[in-house]
């Protein structure tokens, strides 16, 4: 597995799902997944949600430093421009992600009535490995999002909205079946992009944007 992730998950008792298990799960949602694919969700990821955010952050940080050492680390906006990595802090993330209690997939950002799940509850309900389809990241800048899909058109979400605004937008039928990114998904997505394209993700100090990761809320 990438950077030993599969082995670490196996050590926790989380065996990677078989191809037939993933295919069966996707068949059960075939109509919805076909619609989402037409709407631009074409990247498949098998996310090791059962790993801790701290472990995933370290794996991603180590991978960034390795790429930098090998002169294979480039900017998000331009794959020809070398990226100036802060090797002392390769992953710039709020420390609360590793220390605070997280509510996953909250229905609303309300401290007493968020309707979210703990990590253990998510694993119990849907497993420690999450098979997901994601759209191109980052999302378009404000005012330039396209409408994709013929049978069920979907307007791409655009940058420069608040977390509450995005959460409200996801209630619209055109965004059926969609959820915000979790930190675990973001880290694995960023790691995958790094290994495949040698590029960083969401470089907010450059030409990228901060990712809100709506799938995680701190009540």
Give the residues covered by each predicted segment.
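Short acidic-hydrophobic catalytic motif
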Residues: 1-178, 191-219
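Short, well-ordered surface patches within globular domains
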Residues: 182-188, 192
